[in-house]
Amino acid sequence: MPSVDLNSDLAEGFGIWHLTEDEALMDIVSSANIACGLHAGDPEIMAKAFAYAKSRGVAVGAHPGFPDLWGFGRRRMPFTPGEIERLVAYQVGAAQALATYSGHRITYVKVHGALGNIAEQEPEVAVAVANAVKAVDPSLVVLAGPLGAQAPATRDAGLRLAAEIFADRGYTEQGHLIPRSQPGAMIHDPVAAADRIIAMVQSGAVITAQGTHLPTSIDSICVHGDGPKAVETARYVRERLEAAGIAIAPFAP
């Protein structure tokens, strides 16, 4: 039976404030991207998320972003490529430490928000991310879009790439995510999200907002944990995939 991973961005909160429904989503997904403390997350939330993921057999990865609490890591910040390398390395190290503390281990890295968008479009930033991952632990997989700058940068660094598509985001004709400020960027309807995912997985392509098919491998599907219907969407996407004969399994167990 063919399989694909289902992931979500989790541990996104601070103190008593929690944005994501971590436990509900980890009962559905096969991989959890854990915020590393700069755009969201703190030691307590991270440790709890790692421990629960371990108990559910969910793979975990580091989800580093810009240090922008106010903007949730979704605004560009003026860091140089060298500074981005160290920023990513710092957060991956924090995730490794707290995963180990919790009896789990991270197996991959996926950059968050604005940093992820920039890394997909600017080769020097993609190289910085790859360099950081390789320096910290070259066994870690990089989870990223298959049609942007991260794919070649990851491979050139000798790292393994896992190709990710999004259930709840629209795509441009270039295979990038439509900016959140533009129409068609977000897909909130669980049925529409699942319909798109089934079509993309079965056709082996990213399908743009205009209907263009951009052929690619697909290793993982992301449902954003902060969406208003995140749990409902993740559950429905999983049910539809399994009904289509596609198993859900982590790409980096």
Swiss-Prot record:
EC top class named in words: hydrolase
EC number, UniProt record: 3.5.2.9
Pfam families hit by this protein: LamB_YcsF (PF03746)
Domain of life: Bacteria
Record-level GO BP terms: carbohydrate metabolic process
CDD domains assigned: LamB_YcsF_like
Reactions catalysed: 5-oxo-L-proline + ATP + 2 H2O = L-glutamate + ADP + phosphate + H(+)
Keywords: ATP-binding, Hydrolase, Nucleotide-binding
Molecular function as annotated in GO: 5-oxoprolinase (ATP-hydrolyzing) activity; ATP binding
Quaternary structure annotation from Swiss-Prot or TrEMBL: Forms a complex composed of PxpA, PxpB and PxpC.
Family, per entry: Belongs to the LamB/PxpA family.
The protein's role, per its UniProt record: Catalyzes the cleavage of 5-oxoproline to form L-glutamate coupled to the hydrolysis of ATP to ADP and inorganic phosphate.
HAMAP family noted in UniProt: PxpA
Record-given protein name: 5-oxoprolinase subunit A
